[in-house]
Amino acid sequence: MESRKDMVMFLDGGQLGTLVGKRVSNLSEAVSSPLPEPPEKMVPHGCLSPRAGPPTSRERGGGGQEEEPVDGLAGSAAGLGAEPRSAGAAMLGPGPPVPSADSLSGQGQPSSSDTESDFYEEIEVSCTPDCATGNAEYQHSKAPGSDALGSSPTSGSEAPKSNGGSGGSGSQGTLACSASDQMRRYRTAFTREQIARLEKEFYRENYVSRPRRCELAAALNLPETTIKVWFQNRRMKDKRQRLAMTWPHPADPAFYTYMMSHAAAAGGLPYPFPSHLPLPYYSPVGLGAASAASAAASPFSGPLRPLDTFRVLSQPYPRPELLCAFRHPPLYPGPAHGLGASAAAAAAAGPCSCLACHSGPANGLAPRAAAAAAASDFTCASTSRSDSFLTFAPSVLSKASSVAALDQREEVPLTR
C-alpha cells in the first residue's frame, strides 16, 4: 500500500502529472464534442477551417512521447479506479491512419463515384432512338445523386473529376443520339397525285434513269432517294404479283391468258391484252414461222405489266367468250396433251367468237389477231373444249355461266 501511495504522490507532483493533465484536458475537449471525426472529414468542399491545416508540433510529437506513459498510467491506475482515464487515453491514443480519397485514387483503388461514372458511361454510349428523353430523365435523376456525392466525405479534387467524367459521357451520349436520329428513316406519306404520277412512270419504264428521277423529284417535291426507294419497292411488288400467278400458268398457259384477258376487259390493266398472241414467258410449241414473227413484232412481246391479282380472282366470270383462249392448240404441244382428233374436230367446227378475234376496230386488236390466226396452222373454233383441258378448271369461274358445267370436274376438285 505504501508503494502505491508513493507512486500516486509521484504522479501528482512529477512530470508525468503535467502530461496526464494535458491528456485530461484533451479528453475533456473530446468528450465535449459529440462525434470525434477526423478534421478533414468534417470540412466541406469549398470551406477552410483552422483545424484543417497541418497538425501542430504538439500533435506531431505527442504520439511517440506520450504512448509509453499512458500505458504505464493505465497499468498503475487499474487498482485505483482510474478506468475513465485509461478509457480516455485509449480513445485518444494514435489509432490506424484513415486513408484519404487521394491516397486511394493514387494507389489505383477506384472510389464509388468513379465506378458509377464508368458504369453510366457504358450505358449512355449505347443509345436508343428515344435517347433525347432518356438523357433528360437520366440527368434529372442524376442531379440529387451528384449533390449527395458532393456532400459525402471525399476530397475536393475528386468531385471535379467525377463531374468531368459524367459531362464527357453526356456529350458522347448526345453525339450517339444525333447519329441515331439521322440514321432513322420515317415512312413517307405520298399523296394521290404523287402515287398516280409514279405509277404512270413505272408503267412506262420499270427502271428510271437518274436524270428522269431528278425531274420527278423536282415535279413531285420529293427527295430523289425517296423516288429511288419507291421504284425499288414497286419492282418487288410487281415480282410478288407475278409469282402469285404461278399456280395456273406454268402448267396451263392458256388459263393465264384467260386471266389476263379478263383483267384487261374488267379494267384491271392499263393496256389491252391480246389473247391470241403468245405469251413472252413461254416458248409456244406448234406456232408457224409467220405467227412467231408477228408475235415478235408486236408491241406486247415485252414483259407483261403487273395486274391486281386479288381483284381479278375475286370477281365472277361474266364473259364466257373469253374462254376461247383455251381452244388455241398453238399454246400447247400437240402430242403431250393429246390434241390430235379433238383439234381437228375443233378446227372443222366453225369460226371463233372470242373477244380478240371479233372486237371492233376501236381497240386495234382485230387486224393483228386476224393476221396471227391466218398465219398459224389452225382455225379457231367456237365449239366446246376438249376434255384434256378440264384438268385445270379454275374455281374462280361463276357457276351461272354457260361453261360452268364443263369446268367443274369431279376427278380434280379444286378448292381455294
Curated annotation (Swiss-Prot):
InterPro entries: Even-skipped_HD, HD, HD_metazoa, Homeobox_CS, Homeodomain-like_sf. GO terms for molecular function: DNA-binding transcription factor activity, RNA polymerase II-specific; sequence-specific double-stranded DNA binding. Residues 183-242 bind DNA. The keyword Transferase does not apply. Gene3D superfamilies: Homeodomain-like. It is found in: Nucleus. Residues 30-120, 138-178 are annotated as: Disordered. Disulfide bonds: none annotated. It comes from the Eukaryota. GO terms for biological process: embryo development ending in birth or egg hatching; interneuron migration; positive regulation of transcription by RNA polymerase II; regulation of transcription by RNA polymerase II; spinal cord interneuron axon guidance. Coiled coil: none annotated. Residues 102-114 have a biased composition (Polar residues). The keyword Nucleus applies. GO terms for cellular component: axon; neuronal cell body; nucleoplasm. Belongs to the even-skipped homeobox family. May play a role in the specification of neuronal cell types. May play a role in the dorsoventral specification of mesodermal cell fate. This is Homeobox even-skipped homolog protein 1. It comes from Mus musculus. The lineage of its organism: Eukaryota, Metazoa, Chordata, Craniata, Vertebrata.
